[in-house]
Amino acid sequence: MEKTKRLIVRRDAIGFIKSILESYEDIGVLSVIDGDKGLIEIIYSAFFEEDLIAILKDMKNNGIDYMEVNDG
């Protein structure tokens, strides 16, 4: 099953986050929804949800902060 997470991140961190996710093949696909606001969307398989959450937590622990946003 496909799932999504929307996050607001610093604009200058978008490329770094994308490269981290790409280095973990099949974890998720990052799309920029609004680059000016730093709004990104990650589409991922429910199978990899725990892995994705662990990667995001590790990034936050290393200074790449984000805020998860809900649709609507």
Regions found by a protein language model. Name each.
Residues 9-50:
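Amphipathic, hydrophobic secondary-structure cores in small proteins
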Residues 1, 22, 34, 58-60:
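A generic structural signal for short, solvent-exposed coil/turn residues
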Residues 43-72:
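C-terminal structural segments of small proteins and small subunits
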Residues 1-9:
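Short glycine-/aliphatic-rich beta-strand segments at the starts of folded cytosolic domains
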Residues 2, 38-40, 64-66:
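Short, highly charged low-complexity linear segments
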